[in-house]
Structure formats: structure tokens, C-alpha cells
UniProtKB/Swiss-Prot annotation:
<keyword id="KW-0964">Secreted</keyword>
<keyword id="KW-0732">Signal</keyword>
<feature type="glycosylation site" description="N-linked (GlcNAc...) asparagine">
    <location>
        <position position="91"/>
    </location>
</feature>
<feature type="glycosylation site" description="N-linked (GlcNAc...) asparagine">
    <location>
        <position position="210"/>
    </location>
</feature>
<dbReference type="Pfam" id="PF11912">
    <property type="entry name" value="CfaA_B_C"/>
</dbReference>
<feature type="compositionally biased region" description="Gly residues">
    <location>
        <begin position="217"/>
        <end position="231"/>
    </location>
</feature>
<dbReference type="InterPro" id="IPR021837">
    <property type="entry name" value="CfaA/B/C"/>
</dbReference>
<feature type="signal peptide">
    <location>
        <begin position="1"/>
        <end position="17"/>
    </location>
</feature>
<keyword id="KW-0325">Glycoprotein</keyword>
<feature type="compositionally biased region" description="Gly residues">
    <location>
        <begin position="239"/>
        <end position="252"/>
    </location>
</feature>
<feature type="glycosylation site" description="N-linked (GlcNAc...) asparagine">
    <location>
        <position position="159"/>
    </location>
</feature>
<feature type="glycosylation site" description="N-linked (GlcNAc...) asparagine">
    <location>
        <position position="13"/>
    </location>
</feature>
<protein>
    <recommendedName>
        <fullName>Uncharacterized protein DDB_G0290387</fullName>
    </recommendedName>
</protein>
<feature type="region of interest" description="Disordered">
    <location>
        <begin position="213"/>
        <end position="308"/>
    </location>
</feature>
<dbReference type="GO" id="GO:0005576">
    <property type="term" value="C:extracellular region"/>
</dbReference>
<feature type="compositionally biased region" description="Low complexity">
    <location>
        <begin position="267"/>
        <end position="284"/>
    </location>
</feature>
Length: 308
């Protein structure tokens, strides 16, 4: 499939890992130009973008066919936890063209149209289209570090992508103007529209580092760090899992809360005394189902942050 050939166009080296990709198209064949809002999500990462639900993705093989599955977890206030509790599981075959629906709306503040489709793929590197002008890319990094080795989630919009705030109903269009400056058009009930400059970048090859303190989310030890939806910047998390950033414009802040499910040696050392200090309990443990029905050992988790 021609669309899959685009996966070979990555120009940046990333750390090795499995990323589940939701590559957007405007037709049920997932052919032609990539168009809409897409995702590239690290396998096993427990995350919440809008602080309403938590999600976790895994890959599996059944009868020789590969597929991805994900679970939507109810979110406890102040906690990002993904425990298996007999919850409904969504799935899609790798290489299939998957129709957008409420269970694939991972950011309610930027809900995408129901007529959008996703090409489902799995790669060892995070994917986003590098051959399109006017890309707006949001990156979420692991372990509080903004570097190539910590990319956990990528959320991107092609030029003129339309979305809607699922809470307020405000319609939004993301675009880059003739001067290659990022903007968001907001409309109320299809009228009273106005343009808002954004502090993201318009670039087909987005840099994976924090470009400005003014537009970065906090990297504190709190439960989550915030990012501005408009011109406002997010506040740093606090040691007791305190505040998050909220954006201007639509009034709905863009949040991020990720817990990495990888087994990190430095986290093991840092968390040796967690049982003796409940106030610093910024991690939980999980049990990951293996492909053959077994259970792997628990892994340490750690808080991630947003970078632009």
C-alpha cells in the first residue's frame, strides 16, 4: 500500500520501541494524501491527554494476523492508572482502515470528525508525515526530559484540520498561514469566528526538544503537567500532584499525564523508599498481559511531560 511507504520517510532518529500509529485520511480506503489529525503512541504507556480518561495500547497476534488493542479506563481524580478491570477493549487490525469513533477520541478538547479514518500501523519509531507543509505537531516526552530518547506520544494536525471541543462545542480549524505561522480559527455555532495565533511551529520536520520555556508544560513531580491551548502556558506540576495548566481561547486547557510502562533502572533506584513515603507516591505498578496469556512482572512507572 502506498500509504505505508510514507512510514519510511522519517528523517529523525528515535529510541527503539513499538509505536501504534493512527494515520488520518478522509476516505474509507485510507488512500491519497494524509489529511486530518493523527497519533503515534508508545505501546504500554498509560496516558491521559485531556484528564478525562486514561488509555493504554498493546499489540498482539492472532492466527497470524497482527492487531492493536486499547482500553479506555475511568480516571480517578489526580491519578493516571491503567489496571485491567474487565473493561471493554477496542481493537483494529494492523494495516486496516479504521473509522473514527468516540473510543478513538483520545483528546476530547480536540475531537475530530466522525468521517475521518485512520490507517493503523506499528513502527519502531514514532511516525508523523514529514512531506507535508503546514504540519502542527504536539509532542509528549517521557521522564520529564525533552529529547529524542523520550518521545512517548505525538499528536499532529495537517493544514486546515477541523476539530471540535467536545465539552463546549466550539469548532476549531488548525492551519499555517502564508508566512508559515500557526493559527487556530475558533467558531461558535458556525459563526462569530476569530483567529488565534498559536505558539506551536509550522514545520514538516518538527524539532524534538523544548524550544521555549514560555510554551512548555511543567515538568514537576506532580501527577500531570499542563500546556496552553491558546496563548497561555502551562504551570509546573507540584510535588503533591497539584496544579495543571489551562489554555485560553476555548477555555479548555490541554493536559497531559503519561505513565511509562517500561522497566527503567533509574526508576527502580529512585523508588526503593516509596513505601516509606506516601507523599512522594508518583508511580503505580501494573501487570502486563503477554501474548500467550501469561503475566509479566510489574514495572515501575514515571511521570512524563509535554514539549513543543
Amino acid at each position: 500500500m502506498k500509504s505505508l511507504a510514507l512510514l519510511l520517510s522519517l528523517l529523525i532518529n528515535f529510541s527503539i520501541g513499538s509505536y501504534i500509529n493512527f494515520i488520518p485520511y478522509d476516505n474509507s480506503d485510507c488512500t491519497g494524501a494524509i489529511n486530518g489529525g493523527g497519533w503515534s503512541i508508545l505501546e504500554y504507556a498509560c496516558f491521559s491527554i485531556d484528564v478525562r480518561y486514561n488509555y493504554q495500547f498493546t499489540t498482539h497476534t492472532l492466527n497470524g494476523e497482527g492487531f492493536v488493542q486499547w482500553t479506555q479506563f475511568p480516571r480517578v481524580v489526580g491519578k493516571t492508572q491503567c489496571f485491567y478491570q474487565d473493561l471493554p477493549i477496542s481493537n483494529a487490525s494492523i494495516g486496516s482502515c479504521y473509522k473514527n469513533n468516540p473510543l478513538s477520541t483520545f483528546d476530547i478538547f480536540r475531537s475530530l470528525p466522525s468521517n475521518q479514518y485512520y490507517l493503523i500501523s506499528v513502527t519502531s519509531e514514532p511516525f508523523y508525515p514529514t512531506n507535508q507543509a503546514g504540519m502542527i505537531v504536539l509532542q509528549y516526552m517521557g521522564n520529564g526530559e525533552c529529547s529524542n530518547d523520550n518521545v512517548e506520544i505525538m499528536q499532529y494536525f495537517t493544514n486546515n484540520t477541523q476539530s471540535e471541543d467536545g465539552i463546549t462545542g466550539i469548532q476549531m480549524k488548525w492551519y499555517c498561514n502564508d508566512e508559515n505561522e500557526p493559527y487556530e480559527t475558533q467558531c461558535f455555532n458556525g459563526k462569530n469566528c476569530f483567529d488565534m495565533p498559536q505558539q506551536y511551529k509550522c514545520s514538516p520536520t518538527h524539532p524534538f526538544f523544548n524550544t521555549s520555556d514560555e510554551i512548555s508544560g511543567g515538568t514537576g513531580a506532580g501527577d500531570y503537567s499542563g500546556t496552553g491551548s491558546g496563548s497561555s502556558s502551562g504551570n509546573s506540576g507540584t510535588s503533591d500532584g497539584g496544579s495543571s495548566g489551562s489554555g485560553s481561547g476555548s477555555g479548555s486547557g490541554a493536559f497531559i499525564s503519561i505513565i511509562d510502562q517500561n522497566d527503567k533502572n533509574n526508576n527502580k533506584n529512585n523508588n526503593k523508599n516509596k513505601n516509606n513515603n506516601n507523599n512522594n507516591n508518583n508511580y503505580n505498578q501494573y501487570e502486563k498481559s503477554t501474548g500467550d496469556g501469561g503475566i509479566t512482572k510489574p514495572h515501575d512507572n514515571y511521570i512524563s511531560s509535554f514539549c513543543t
